[in-house]
Amino acid sequence: LVAMGHEAWTLEETTTRVRKSLREAFPELFGDRWEEARDIFYGAYREVHLERVEKIDGAEDMIGLLQPQGSHLGVVSNKSGGHLRAESTKLGWDRFFAGYLIGATDAPNDKPATDPIYMALEGTGIDPGPDIWFIGDTWVDIACGRAAKCHTILVGDNDPESAEFSDHPPDEHYLSCRDLLEVVRRL
């Protein structure tokens, strides 16, 4: 932001404001200079992102329970596809997702559009619908899942009663992956 003449955001501001993919958010933020801003951002991001990647508590246990049951697992993210796949490899999670890691710019449109969901299900014979769990931690995730008619699950401390979820409330809400894991264990 600073390199592009904007004031820096605090971590809290960043967490609140960053929802859309870069290709959708940067033109709004930086206008005609968005590609320059993208190059600056990715230059800085590449230097540190794999060093800071950490597993979310309970996430690996949950996907480790679901996959052997025959559940199709995929990730739909507004993080760039290359970065998403590099993180999966670093975490040792490629075995769970069998190539179904869909990041920003992999599909024609990014979340909240449904294109990435269809891409994540391509070749599986599975159609989006209420039997498909779409789990996320932001309104963009829930809006995407609801638009595809999936069962939406909000995980984290975002308040599902807040204004950002008024047009697309989640079907379920859990404060942590560990809480959702307890539900998965009972399946």
Label each region the model flagged.
Residues H49-V53, N78, T152:
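Short, flexible loop segments at the rims of nucleotide/cofactor-binding pockets, characterized by
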Residues Q69-G70, H168:
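Structured helix-beta-strand junction loops
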